[in-house]
Amino acid sequence: MRRIRVNDALVLIITFSLLIISSITLSIINNYSGPYKFVYGQPDQKNFNITHSQNIQNIPIKKIHVGDINIAYKVFGKGKPILLISGSGLVMDAWEPSLLKELSSNHTVIIFDNRGVGNTTIGIKPFSIQQSATDTVGFLDALKIQKADVLGFSMASFIAQEITLLHPEKVNRLILYGATCGGEGNIPQAPQVVKILSDLVNNRTQDPEKILSVTFPLEWVKSHPNRTIPESKEIVTSNTLKQQFNLNEAWLAPNWSGVCSQLSKISKPTLVITGTEDVAVPAANSLIIVEKIPGSWLVQIKGGGHGLMYQYPEQFSKIVKAFLETA
């Protein structure tokens, strides 16, 4: 591990050998008969326990009314609250179990389904990053949580940035994973990646190799064909996927300023984490963010894709925990 100073950001360059696991392509892989074998279940219990006796699937779902929706959520662990905001197409049970176990050892962990996802109702208000931020702040208020550590993954990193800029009093420490500040400052996806995502959302492809290539370096999929995939009973409808895809595209579009120019206002301790091989949100976007947020930390995992927390869960979890303990 090397530590170097770049524009007031602490940059940690970490090289790991990676494992592979996917939790966002379950419906495609369920019907897949190709050369890769994806095994469902929990063969290694030590990696999946949230506490000594309780698994995430068995934690009761609670619901609370926020604005025009009922938000489904789970709470576990003890300590200061940390809110995990899920990315596009992900239900709350998609969080890597090792991360949840690590965090719950000294935090009250809160996971939830975004608007229209899983067990959360869709409501009548239009989908947008701003509305998602409003939903999330309203959720914290409904739970009577004054301030929390906030971790946002992918699309949720956009939401987390909005919350921190508009409601800084609600955020203790900020973790942005697979992030970009959007707009004209965004480093765009390659055209072939845009096409794969568009084809997936519009049901024009069910090719698991193409889909996995957006989330993971494909060579790792091929070299780790028997990884266990966390299974969830929750669903994300095609309508919600399209809505989330559209709000992602709106955030990434070059015809607005994004929030890059506003990030210097953030004074919260901030960790930005990415994989060097992330093609869904190119890793260069993370460097832009840490150059804007004073004193922020950047962790780049060599060879990691957008789904790096599934590729190397224990190391990802330790990085997050170390930041929370020292920042």
Residues covered by each model-derived region:
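Conserved HGGG/HGGXW glycine-rich cap/lid loop of the alpha/beta-hydrolase fold
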Residues: 69-119
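Active-site loop/oxyanion-hole signature of alpha/beta-hydrolase fold enzymes
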Residues: 111, 115-151
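Short glycine-enriched nucleophile-adjacent loop
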Residues: 157-168, 174
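Flexible "cap/lid" loop of the alpha/beta hydrolase fold
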Residues: 165, 174-203
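Conserved alpha/beta-hydrolase catalytic His-Asp/Glu region
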Residues: 206-257, 261-262
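Short beta-strand/loop motif that positions the catalytic acidic residue
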Residues: 266, 272-274
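Catalytic active-site module of serine/aspartate enzymes centered on a nucleophile-bearing elbow/loop
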Residues: 296-327
